[in-house]
A protein has these predicted regions:
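Right-handed parallel beta-helix
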Residues: 285-288, 306-317, 337-348, 359-375, ...
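Extracellular beta-strand-rich solenoid/capping regions of secreted or surface-exposed proteins
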Residues: 249, 253-254, 269-283, 291-339, ...
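Juxtadomain low-complexity/linker regions and immediately adjacent membrane-anchoring helices
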Residues: 52-81, 219-230, 712, 716-746, ...
Length: 840
C-alpha cells in the first residue's frame, strides 16, 4: 500500500480572495510489498555518542595474561569506550599533547555545559577514582549522576598539582597534565548501574578531560587491633582541622615503649612536618578511610634499625612542582631491616618512596602511587634483598620504579607483578646499576619523552656510582605503547633500552626473556651509549619475546657490543631491517647480533644507517567499509556483495576467523593468512526472516593491528505491511506555503501537502521509491480530525520505472474518506505492478 492522504482545509475555512479548490494530498505513504521488493528503514533517534572500537594501540594494560601485572581491587573503564557527548581526543604520540599522556593515547573532553561521560558498571562498586585534566590554573567541580539522579556530592578537581615544566627537555617541556580525584558513594551499586560525569551549569572549569575511571568495591573500614595505641588518644584531630603532628609522634613513642602498634582510625589528619621513626608498626583503617594530609610523612635522614611497617592508610599531598632539592617525599630515607609496606595510597607528593641510607629484606606491596611529581619508588643505594610487588603506579613525573646504585650498590632487588602506566617523563622501570636484580612479570604502558618501558642502564647521574654487575634478570614483562622520542637526542628510545651511558656493560649478564612488546611507536630493543661516548653493550641475551606492531625496527643499535637473540617473533613491523650504526665511530654494523633459532617476522638486514621514520603499521583495510543491501523480502536472499580485505603491512597477517552476525552469510578467499601487500575477498548475502531494519557485522580476526577488522552490514526485511514510501523523496506540481510535498512521506497523518491555490488541473504528487519495486496497494490518509468531514475525491494512479514515462495503473475513480473510519482510503493495484515512481 502506498499511503497517500488527499487533504483539504476543514469546512468553513476560506481565505479571502482565494478559491479553496486546491488539491491537497499525501500525509503518509505506505506500500504493501508483493514478491521481492525493497523497503525503507525507519530512522533511529538521536542518542549520545558511544565510542567506536578503539584503534589497535588502545590495548589495555589490564588485558594481559594472568600472572602478569598487579592483581588490582578495581575495574578500570576508559572514557573513550564509554558513552559520551563530549569530544574524543587522540590518538596521539606528540610530545606535550593531552591525548599523548592519556591511557591508550585517547581521552574524552567535555567542552560545553551538559556534556558528559557515562560508565556502565560491569561489577559492584562503592567508590571510584577518576583520572582527569583541567586547563592550567583551573579548579572546579564536576557533577556525578547515578542512574540519572544527581548526587549531592560533587567531584572537586584542580590543576594545582599538575603541569610540571622541565627545562632540560627540548621542545615542549611541560608534562604531567593529569591528576586523580576519588569519591565514595556511601552505598554499593551493582553491575548495570550507570555513573555519569557531567559538566553542569555550576561546573565551570571547562574543558574537563576525562581519561579513565577506576571503580572499587572497598571493604568496610578495619577496626582497631589489639595491642595498639590510637593517635586520637594522643590528641590527633580526625577532622583534619588541627595539626596532628605532635599527636602522631607521641603515639609512636608510646607504642614503642609499650611494644605495641600505632592505630590511625578513620578520618583525615594534618601532618605539618615529617616524622622521624626508628621503628614502628603504623596501621590504618584502610587507604580509603585513614587519610593523612601531608607532602612528607616520614623523613629518616640516616639509617635506622627498623623495621618501620606501614599499612592501610593514604598519604595525600599537595606538592606544586617538582622539588629535587628537598626531601619532600611521602616516605623518605631508611625504614630499616625487614620492613613491610602494605596497602598505602600515595598521591600528589614529590616522590612516593625515596628509599636511601639503608633498607634491607623489605617488601612494598598492594600500594597505589599516583600523580607524583618525580619517581613512584626509587631505591637510592644501600638497598638489598627487597621486593616491590603487586603495586599500581600511574602518572609519575619521572621513573615509575627505579633502582639507582648511588652512593653505593643496590643488590637483590625484585620488581614483580606491578602495573605502571603513564609515566610522563623517563621510564616505566629503570635499573641504574647494581647487581643481581630482577624485573619480572610487570606491565608498563604509555611512556613519554625520555622514556622506555624498561631501561637497564649504567647512567650514573652522580658519583660514586656502582655499575651493573652479576646477573640482571628481566622476564615475562608486557610493555604496551612504550618507547618515545627523545627530544634531546633527536631520535627515539626503544621500548627496552640497554644503555652503557657512563660505562660499558662489562661485568654483567642481562637476560631478557618472555613477555611481549606491543604497539611501540618506535623500536622494540635499543642498544646505546646515551652519553655519546660509544661504550659497549655486551652480555645481553634476549629470548622468547613476542613483538607486535612497531613503528620502526625490532633492533636499534647505536654503539658496539654483542647480543644473543633467539625466539623473538614479530608481526606488524613498521620498517624492515635493523638500525645498526655505531656512534661516535660512525660504523655501519658495529653491533653484533648472534641469531639463534626461533626468530621470525624480522631481520637484521638491511642495515640502516639513518634513523627511519616511524611507519606505524596500518590495520587491514576493507573496501567498501560498509554494505547496504537495501530492501529484501522476508524469506528471500539478496545478491552477493563483495568486500576486499587488504593487508598494507610488511608481514603476513594470519587469519583466525571470518564471521558475520545477524541474517547475513559469507564466503571468503582469505584462507589462513593474507600476505604482506596482499588481499582477499569476502562475499556477503542478506536473507531476512522478519521485517524491519536488520543490521550485522562482518568481522575478520587476524594477527594484524586493529584486529578484528569490521564492516557494518545493513538491510531491511520487507513484509506485506512494510512502509516503502516512508522518508522517500516526494515532488509535486505545486505547493502552498508550508504544505509541501515532503509532508506526504513523513509518516505523520497530521501534516499534508496542498497545491497552490488556483493552479490548473491536473495537479500531481509523485513519490520516488528509490528503486523499481513490486507494489500491491496504495493507502491514502486525510488528517483524522473530525473537522475533516466525509468527502469523496476523484483520483487516478500512474506509475513509472524511469520518472519520465508514466502509464496508468488505476483509472480515475471516486474514493470516500470518512472520519469515523480514520479518513483512510485504499486503492488496490493490478497484480504484478512494478514501479519506482508512483504518481497520484
Amino acid at each position: 500500500m502506498l499511503a497517500m492522504s488527499l487533504l483539504r482545509r476543514p469546512p468553513g475555512w476560506v481565505p479571502a480572495a482565494r478559491s479553496w479548490k486546491r488539491l491537497a494530498a499525501l500525509a503518509a505513504a505506505l506500500v504493501t510489498a508483493l514478491g521481492t521488493v525493497l523497503a525503507i528503514a525507519v530512522a533511529t533517534p538521536t542518542i549520545a555518542q558511544a565510542a567506536t572500537a578503539p584503534p589497535y594501540w588502545a590495548q589495555s594494560p589490564f588485558s594481559v595474561p594472568g600472572g602478569t601485572g598487579a592483581s588490582l581491587p578495581f575495574t578500570e573503564y576508559e572514557a573513550e569506550n564509554a558513552s559520551y557527548t563530549g569530544k574524543l581526543i587522540g590518538p596521539d604520540f606528540t610530545q606535550g599533547d593531552l591525548a599523548t599522556e592519556a591511557s591508550g593515547r585517547e581521552a574524552v573532553q567535555l567542552t560545553a555545559t551538559g556534556q558528559y561521560v557515562q560508565f556502565t558498571l560491569t561489577s559492584a562498586a562503592n567508590a571510584f577514582d577518576v583520572h582527569y585534566a583541567l586547563p592550567q590554573g583551573a579548579s572546579g567541580t564536576l557533577s556525578v549522576y547515578v542512574n540519572g539522579t544527581k548526587l549531592s556530592n560533587e567531584l572537586s578537581l584542580t590543576s594545582a598539582y599538575s603541569y610540571i615544566t622541565t627545562s632540560s627537555i627540548l621542545g615542549s617541556d611541560t608534562h604531567k597534565f593529569y591528576d586523580d580525584a576519588r569519591m565514595m558513594f556511601g552505598q554499593t551499586y551493582q553491575a548495570g548501574t550507570t555513573v555519569r560525569l557531567e559538566a553542569d551549569s555550576s561546573d565551570t572549569a571547562l574543558p574537563y578531560t576525562i581519561d579513565v575511571a577506576d571503580f572499587y568495591d572497598v571493604p568496610a573500614a578495619a577496626t582497631q587491633p589489639a595491642n595498639s595505641i590510637s593517635v586520637t588518644s594522643e590528641g590527633a584531630d580526625p577532622t583534619g582541622a588541627a595539626d596532628s603532628t605532635t599527636a602522631f609522634r607521641n603515639a609512636i613513642s608510646a607504642a614503642n615503649s609499650a611494644g605495641e602498634s600505632v592505630w590511625i582510625p578513620s578520618g583525615t589528619y594534618l601532618i605539618s612536618s615529617a616524622l622521624q621513626v626508628n621503628s614502628a608498626t603504623i596501621i590504618g583503617a584502610g587507604d580509603w578511610y585513614s587519610q593523612i594530609k601531608t607532602n612528607e610523612f616520614i623523613d629518616n635522614t640516616s639509617a635506622v634499625s627498623g623495621p618501620v611497617n606501614l599499612s592501610g592508610f593514604a598519604i595525600l599531598g599537595s606538592t606544586v612542582g617538582r622539588h629535587d632539592d628537598s626531601t619532600a617525599n611521602a616516605i623518605d630515607g631508611s625504614l630499616g631491616n625487614g620492613f613491610t609496606v602494605n596497602g598505602l595510597w600515595i598521591q600528589d607528593t614529590n616522590v612516593g618512596f625515596w628509599l636511601q641510607y639503608g633498607n634491607s629484606n623489605c617488601t612494598v606491596e598492594n600500594t597505589v602511587i599516583e600523580s607524583t611529581d618525580a619517581d613512584g619508588l626509587n631505591f637510592n643505594g644501600n638497598a638489598t634483598n627487597c621486593t616491590v610487588k603487586n603495586n599500581f603506579i600511574r602518572n609519575t613525573g619521572d621513573d615509575g620504579l627505579a633502582i639507582w646504585s648511588y652512593p653505593s650498590a643496590d643488590s637483590g632487588i625484585t620488581f614483580a607483578n606491578n602495573t605502571i602506566v603513564q609515566p610522563t617523563l623517563a621510564n616505566g622501570i629503570a635499573d641504574y646499576g647494581g647487581s643481581n636484580n630482577t624485573i619480572s612479570n610487570n606491565v608498563v604502558a604509555d611512556t613519554e619523552p625520555l622514556g622506555s618501558g624498561i631501561a637497564i642502564s649504567n647512567e650514573q647521574f652522580l658519583s660514586p656510582f656502582t655499575p651493573l654487575s652479576g646477573t640482571i634478570t628481566v622476564s615475562g614483562n608486557y610493555l604496551i605503547r612504550t618507547g618515545a622520542m627523545n627530544p634531546n637526542w633527536g631520535h627515539p628510545m626503544g621500548a627496552v633500552r640497554f644503555d652503557a651511558y657512563d660505562s660499558a656493560f662489562s661485568n654483567v649478564t642481562v637476560n631478557y626473556s618472555g613477555g611481549a612488546i606491543l604497539d611501540s611507536p618506535y623500536e622494540a630493543f635499543e642498544f646505546v651509549s646515551g652519553s655519546g661516548n660509544g661504550y659497549a653493550v655486551n652480555g645481553v641475551n634476549i629470548s622468547n619475546v613476542n613483538v607486535q606492531n612497531l613503528g620502526t625496527v625490532v633492533m636499534q643499535a647505536e654503539t658496539s657490543g654483542t647480543a644473543n637473540v633467539s625466539g623473538v617473533t614479530a608481526s606488524g613491523v613498521g620498517v624492515s631491517g635493523a638500525y645498526n650504526y655505531g656512534y661516535p665511530s660512525n660504523t655501519a654494523g658495529a653491533y653484533t647480533f648472534n641469531l639463534g633459532s626461533g626468530n621470525s617476522g624480522w631481520s637484521t638486514t638491511p642495515v640502516l644507517t639513518a634513523f627511519p621514520n616511524p611507519a606505524q603499521p596500518g590495520s587491514l583495510t576493507a573496501s567498501p567499509s560498509s554494505l547496504s543491501f537495501g530492501d529484501v523480502a522476508s524469506g528471500a536472499k539478496s545478491a552477493a556483495q563483495t568486500v576486499t580485505v587488504s593487508n598494507p603491512g610488511g608481514s603476513a597477517a594470519s587469519v583466525s576467523s571470518v564471521s558475520v552476525s545477524g541474517p547475513y552469510s559469507q564466503t571468503n578467499t582469505c584462507g589462513s593468512s593474507i600476505a604482506a601487500g596482499g588481499s582477499c575477498t569476502v562475499s556477503v548475502t542478506f536473507a531476512p526472516t522478519s521485517g524491519g531494519s536488520l543490521t550485522g557485522t562482518l568481522s575478520v580476526a587476524t594477527s594484524a593491528p586493529g584486529s578484528p577488522l569490521t564492516v557494518a552490514l545493513s538491510g531491511t526485511g520487507v513484509t506485506a505491511t512494510t512502509n516503502l514510501a516512508l522518508g522517500q523523496l516526494a515532488t509535486a506540481s505545486s505547493s502552498y506555503e508550508t504544505y509541501v510535498a515532503s509532508n506526504v512521506t513523513d509518516g505523520n497523518t497530521s501534516t499534508y501537502w496542498e497545491s497552490t491555490d488556483g493552479a490548473g488541473y491536473p495537479q500531481t504528487i509523485t513519490v520516488d521509491l528509490g528503486s523499481v519495486q513490486s507494489i500491491g496497494s496504495l493507502t491514502l490518509d486525510l488528517p483524522p480530525s473530525s473537522a475533516w468531514a466525509t468527502r469523496t475525491e476523484t483520483l487516478s494512479v500512474l506509475g513509472s520505472t524511469n520518472g519520465t514515462t508514466f502509464s496508468q495503473l488505476v483509472g480515475s475513480a471516486g474514493y470516500t474518506f470518512n472520519p469515523s473510519t480514520g479518513n483512510t482510503a485504499t486503492i488496490s493495484l493490478p497484480s504484478g505492478t512494478t514501479a519506482r515512481y508512483v504518481q497520484l
